[in-house]
UniProtKB/Swiss-Prot annotation:
Keywords linked to the UniProt accession: Cytoplasm, Initiation factor, Protein biosynthesis, RNA-binding, rRNA-binding
Name of this protein: Translation initiation factor IF-1 2
Alphabetized SMART domains for the sequence: S1
Gene Ontology CC terms, in alphabetical order: cytosol
Domain S1-like: 1-72
Gene that produces this protein: infA2
Lineage start: Bacteria, Pseudomonadati, Thermodesulfobacteriota, Desulfovibrionia, Desulfovibrionales
SUPFAM superfamilies: Nucleic acid-binding proteins
Subunit structure: Component of the 30S ribosomal translation pre-initiation complex which assembles on the 30S ribosome in the order IF-2 and IF-3, IF-1 and N-formylmethionyl-tRNA(fMet); mRNA recruitment can occur at any time during PIC assembly.
Job of this protein: One of the essential components for the initiation of protein synthesis. Stabilizes the binding of IF-2 and IF-3 on the 30S subunit to which N-formylmethionyl-tRNA(fMet) subsequently binds. Helps modulate mRNA selection, yielding the 30S pre-initiation complex (PIC). Upon addition of the 50S ribosomal subunit IF-1, IF-2 and IF-3 are released leaving the mature 70S translation initiation complex.
Protein localization: Cytoplasm
Length: 72
């Protein structure tokens, strides 16, 4: 079975939570719980509240996501 395509959306980090989790408000107004992707963790990319980020959402659970990119 092929992996389903993730939905990519942009948002702003509202709050940093324990265990590298973040509360992210998406452009459409929804709020999701997101964690950092492995490559961002590996290269110690810091994410702070107020940062604009790109989030991948699974089509199966739209309340959780993975932060894949931090905008400059």
């Amino acid at each position: 079975m092929a992996k389903e395509d993730a939905i990519e959306v942009d948002g702003i980090v509202q709050e940093a939570l324990p265990n590298a989790m973040f509360q992210v408000e998406l452009e459409n107004g929804h709020t999701v719980l997101a964690h950092i992707s492995g490559k961002m963790r590996k290269f110690y990319i810091r994410i702070l509240p107020g940062d604009k980020v790109r989030v991948e959402l699974s089509p199966y659970d739209l309340n959780r996501g993975r932060i894949t990119y931090r905008m400059k």
